[in-house]
Amino acid sequence: MKFSDFSQSGKPSKADEYLGLLMAAQAYFHSAHFETKSYARHKAYDFIFSELPDLIDKFGEQYLGYSGRKYTPSIPDASKLPTDTIKMIDRILDQSNSIYKEMPPAIQSTIDDITGMFYQSKYLLSLE
């Protein structure tokens, strides 16, 4: 089986776009982890990129199972992402909220886990 068997061409859904943003965020925060000179921020970014992969996978598999759709890749251009990590978190939280009501309760629970992790990360990033 090939990746193309799971993807389709055409317009991505809001969930595809959300999934793409989360996948981009994984690399984004890993990069910030290496770039920072602050130990507190280093540990906060470590928390994000340690927790996020399983949450991305869980959301993606749940959504694809629920919708019966094939995944349409929609990863945002890195040059269009905020350079400030708090603004990036806020963007993810906004997109989480925008798809929340469209999802069944089980997937809403996963989105709750994702948003909870990012709210905790905002707190961790506020520490010195």
UniProtKB/Swiss-Prot annotation:
Entries under InterPro entries matching the protein: DUF5856
Q: Name one Pfam family in it.
A: DUF5856
Entry protein name: Uncharacterized 14.6 kDa protein in mobD-ri intergenic region
Annotated organism of origin: Enterobacteria phage T4 (Bacteriophage T4)
The upper taxonomy is: Viruses, Duplodnaviria, Heunggongvirae, Uroviricota, Caudoviricetes
The gene from which this protein is expressed is y05O
